[in-house]
Amino acid sequence: LPFIAFCAAAGFAQIIGTNLLLMAFGYRNYVAGTAFAKTEAMQGALLAFLLLGETLSWLTISGIAVGVAGVMIVAAGGQRLRLPDIVQPAALCGLGAGLGFTMTSIFVKSASLELATSDKLLAALVALVVVQGWQTLMQGSYVAVREREQLPRVFSTWRTSGQVGLLAALGSACWFTGFATAPVALVRAVGQVEVILTLGFSRFYLREARKPGEA
């Protein structure tokens, strides 16, 4: 029962975090929301210590802080962030999104620890299947009840959405495996490399111009 509860909580927290991040895009100063969402690694270090008892060396914490600061600067796209920005709706949504993703990490790790197996990879993959199954049920039910007209569109684009879903599932499998085998904050911090990969993909594959703040 605790395993199912942790998986359900992880799925719900991830949905809330994603919705808050999308809400941040709807505000004028959405850049602040995106930047503050990148504080998830620092939030993870604090909450994992309080809830899971995970401890990190001061050197590791300092490295995470520097990494988070760098990612926030890149995410801000050259825009200067000030302390008052933290109370803006976009920033609050960003912080809430970071908290949602952090709690997802903690719930996933807790779920993996509940399984009676020493195979952490197996535990992570079982948790992944349950979490994504629960998310599919929740969101599918919502669409079926509230936005039924969207269902034909979903099925008509199954080829494209299937490819995206497969890549997302593979990414989630890596995330879940990381959470099951290493401290939450470290996994989140290393995962920030996605920003560098995104910039590289944007520059060399999509041929998009680089912004001054990304230099």
Which residues fall in each region the model found?
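Short hydrophobic/small-residue motifs within alpha-helical transmembrane segments
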Residues: 11-12, 38-39, 99, 166, ...
